[in-house]
Amino acid sequence: MEFKILKILVPGKYGSGTSSICRRFSENKFIIKRTSRIGIDFVRKVIHYKENQFTIQLWEEAHNERFNTISRRYYRNSNGFLLVFTPTERSSIEYIKNENEYIMSNAKTKNNVKYLIESKSDLCEKREVSKEEAIAVSKEYGYKYFECSALTGENVHEIVHCIMRDIIEVELLSKNDKKYLTNKDRNNKCIIF
């Protein structure tokens, strides 16, 4: 059995649900009270996949301009990005559009796996950002698009498993390390709506 750490950054505007998604993934519970962070925070969880052990680290940044320089350093060593926005606040999708620029200039490679995550899918009746607009943004930047709810737990674990498989395919197979995925796995694409 081999062991690998996968570092996934989870940027998003304050209040978009990044902390709730991270906690739902790591602890499988929803925490109502939001706390302010200083700098950067992460959660981790061990996942067994194809007779190998992966530690998935979800890193989220403080939503404070003073710490942007610190946060951007973490982009260089990341394997992927879950860019989170809430459809209930238009400014959160604008934040993602700006964040794309930082990712492209600070990530170690342009081939990092990037997903656009619509959080709070349980609040769709309060939409300010249509599903069609979100899908258009994801296509414009070459991101895969997913919806989830940290409150209900809908799709949170599935999204992390999908990005894990995509990272393995992009990074490990690019190093000719074919033992992680079979042909069947390569044909199994994640699509969650």
Residue ranges of predicted features:
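Polybasic, Ser/Thr-rich amphipathic helices
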Residues: 182-193
